Amino acid sequence: MIGTIKHKGLRLYEKNDRSGIRPDLVDKAQKILSALEASDSPEDMALPMFRFHPLTGDRRGTYSLTVKANWRVTFRFHNAAAYDVNLEDYR
């Protein structure tokens, strides 16, 4: 389940509004958001196509999924829900 979305563009999942996200990222981002909505734990997202991995250091407790190239969806998980779902450019 998705608890909170941090990135305005990812609200496309709630409102089906694609204007806040690059067109080449929309399809994969929608797949990731649908999978997050259906997940009960971060490990549910450990599919090869998402390249799931936990972050370390000061980002410990945050997980990352690859959208395309250097673009990632990051999130925290608590009580069977994803929080602070964000779209980040890892440059």
Kindly give the residue locations of the regions a language model identified:
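Basic, Lys/Arg-enriched alpha-helical interface segments
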Residues: 1-66, 78-91
